Amino acid sequence: MTAKENVELALQICKNPRDAETVLKEVGLGERLNNFPSQLSGGEQQRVSIARALAKNPKMLLCDEPTGALDYVTGKQILKLLQDTCRKQKMTVLVITHNSAIAPMADRVIRIKNGKAASVCTNPSPVSVEDIEW
């Protein structure tokens, strides 16, 4: 199935989904809507997965290494999209990452050590993704 069909399939079980094409454009795949997985790079496939998750319009979104297969610029674009979506849609977005440099964008940072929460810090002034470098 195409990238668009992949996202649309996931929306069949949702009460209040977002438009598949719109979300695919938001993740930078507006020109790849009708491409099949074999025609997409690993990073593009990851963005289809992110689009599928965002299009479901959940109250909580768990993102495990959302920038793992992405280049620096695309990774920042996706993090910015997640940050903006969190704010605009009042969605809780949990980002699990080994990249501690992106912690300043978070409202709250939970550091895990040996499978347990080692610390929990609230960030009163989250930084925009554009201002973060790694």
PLM region spans:
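Short, flexible helix/strand-to-coil boundary loops that buttress conserved ligand/catalytic motifs
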Residues: 106-107, 121
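Conserved beta-strand-loop-alpha-helix hinge in the C-terminal portion
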Residues: 116-134
